């Protein structure tokens, strides 16, 4: 009986590319903050969210959770050689400014801060007013 040899499929490791500049997308919602760091073409280098770094429930919406998420994403991106970034903010959550401050404190040079919050031209009906 002839045994057919099959090649073992190993896990492909992504090679770290040296990317000097990139774009940081910060999406700050009322429930969470998501920080994605991409190269200028839009390919994701690293990402982090308040839930990924260990916060759950109402603590995800805090400014401190956004700070920790931004530091985590920046640290992983700086391993790829990232130095200078543009920041694109989206949303009206608590973690907007604190995420930008954390990026600067992590050692990234912020060249542009852009606000891309989507504003409806009288689109969908908003959710009900909160009564406390």
Curated annotation (Swiss-Prot):
Annotated disulfide bonds: none
GO cellular component term, pick one: ribosome
Regions that span the bilayer: none
InterPro entries: Ribosomal_uS11, Ribosomal_uS11_bac-type, Ribosomal_uS11_CS, Ribosomal_uS11_sf
GO MF annotation list: rRNA binding; structural constituent of ribosome
Name of a matching Pfam family: Ribosomal_S11
Keywords recorded for this protein, A-Z: Ribonucleoprotein, Ribosomal protein, RNA-binding, rRNA-binding
Protein family: Belongs to the universal ribosomal protein uS11 family.
Complex and partners: Part of the 30S ribosomal subunit. Interacts with proteins S7 and S18. Binds to IF-3.
Function, in words: Located on the platform of the 30S subunit, it bridges several disparate RNA helices of the 16S rRNA. Forms part of the Shine-Dalgarno cleft in the 70S ribosome.
Designated name of the protein: Small ribosomal subunit protein uS11
Gene: rpsK
């Amino acid at each position: 009986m002839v045994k057919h040899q099959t090649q073992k499929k190993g896990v492909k490791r992504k090679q770290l590319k040296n990317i000097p500049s990139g774009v940081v997308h910060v999406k700050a919602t009322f429930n969470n903050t998501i920080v994605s760091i991409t190269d200028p073409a839009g390919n994701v280098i690293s990402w982090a969210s308040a839930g990924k770094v260990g916060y759950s429930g109402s603590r995800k919406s805090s400014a401190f959770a956004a700070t920790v998420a931004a530091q985590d994403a920046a640290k992983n991106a700086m391993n790829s050689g990232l130095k200078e970034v543009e920041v694109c903010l989206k949303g009206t959550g608590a973690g907007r400014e604190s995420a930008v401050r954390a990026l600067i404190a992590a050692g990234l040079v912020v060249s542009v801060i852009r606000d891309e919050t989507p504003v409806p031209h009288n689109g969908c009906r908003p959710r009900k007013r909160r009564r406390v």
